[in-house]
Amino acid sequence: MRKIYIIIVAVLSICIWLLLTNNPKQIPRASTSIKEKLAAVKDYKYYLDKGNNTIGKEMQKMDLVIVEPIEMQQQYIEAAQEQGALIYGYINAMEADKWNETLYNQLQEDDFYKDEYGKKMYFDEWDSYLMDMTSAHYQDLLLEEIQKQIVDKGLDGVFLDTVGNIDSFLPPEEQVKQNQAMLTFIKKIKQHYNGLSVAQNWGFQTLANYTAPYIDFIMWENFSYDVVGEDDWSLEKIAQLEHIREKFGTQVMTIGFSNETQSRALAEKHHFKFFYNPAGSYYNSWH
């Protein structure tokens, strides 16, 4: 009797397996990961102003859109996500913009970066100040901003702008401190917000030496052939980013400001994502 029971159970198990195998709809499938979706991106946009019905429809055609969540209306964000677009929200990491009064008015004096003479660094073009990422108070403010602007609005990830300021504007000894603090901050984002996807703008050495294991894509602005096509430093960075992508899956999103055809061809040669923005580093116009 026991043998008959075992045979019946085995036959039933095989029948159930065959039914499931021949009916794919019955088989639960793992959702595509953020990294896989980013690797498959064909069309993306970086846009930091308000939306309208026309822009909202264009967003739905994109694989990835980076928006200013303070400006972009929630209805357009959600509609684009429903069509499969990834939406990342802009957060200015190493600068404080005076236009963002709600955040700016919460800053303390120790949150601002100061040089050896105690002088702040002001960027006239953007009406912003360089910040000190080693400030625990400043990190807490940014985490609150990410909660309010990214997590609460259901965005797919956070895009940290101005990370490259560390390499570009600070002396070597200060770079180490700020890079270590940036790494700590990004780890906090991951811990606080259930592994939220994080991207960064510029900061190639920061990426290579510190943040790569936690960054899903890096942006390279002015990836224009006349700037990078035959430049030794740029070619070295291209190779470095390819190595990082192979090791960590970090995608490279490039933006060309000139020479669209050649710039796009160079990006595609290295399997970088590309879009053309003749307005340069101003992203307040969709076209």
Feature annotation, model-predicted:
Residues 1-4:
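Positively charged n-region of N-terminal signal peptides that target proteins for export
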Residues 6-7, 36:
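Alpha-helical interaction segments
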Residues 7-18:
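Hydrophobic membrane-insertion alpha-helices, especially the h-region
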Residues 15, 21-287:
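Glycan-processing catalytic domains of CAZymes
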